[in-house]
Swiss-Prot record:
Localization per Swiss-Prot or TrEMBL: Cytoplasm
Protein name: Holo-[acyl-carrier-protein] synthase
Gene3D superfamilies reported in the protein's UniProt record: 4'-phosphopantetheinyl transferase domain
Protein source organism: Streptomyces avermitilis (strain ATCC 31267 / DSM 46492 / JCM 5070 / NBRC 14893 / NCIMB 12804 / NRRL 8165 / MA-4680)
Pfam families assigned to the protein according to its UniProt record, in alphabetical order: ACPS
Length: 123
């Protein structure tokens, strides 16, 4: 296996919160419903959502930042162990297939008012 692409992104949590509050329906355009909710059905916290948004941006960068990708075609989910994972479908899966991506690695963090994500596409 070799690295096909690496993406990194950061999101200021308060700015991300303001964007969601200012733009009704934005969360639904960025995230699948299961990304918005915790396993117990409660709404996920803003820092966690900001990190997931950063991951989606990082995915696009790892794929060469092509246009035409849909936010909801890159889903960030978490294993029971707490390890973040990436599931791609539609436009993102098509671009990944073009490049020969076979696996993804994702790391999320949020601290001091900033959320960040690193994504590695491997093929």
């Amino acid at each position: 296996m070799s690295i096909i692409g690496v993406g990194i992104d950061v999101a200021e949590i308060d700015r991300f919160r303001a964007s969601l509050e200012r733009t009704p329906g934005l969360a639904d355009r960025l995230f699948l419903e299961r990304e918005l909710l915790l396993p117990n059905g409660e709404r996920r916290g803003i820092a966690s959502l900001a990190a997931r948004f950063a991951a989606k941006e990082a995915v696009a960068k790892a794929l060469g930042a092509p246009g035409g990708l849909y936010w909801t075609d890159a889903e960030v989910w978490v294993e029971d162990s707490g390890r973040p994972r990436l599931r791609v479908t539609g436009t993102v899966a098509a671009r990944a297939a073009e490049l020969g991506v076979q696996s993804w690695h994702v790391s999320l963090s949020h601290d001091a008012g900033v959320a960040s994500a690193v994504v590695v596409a491997e093929g």
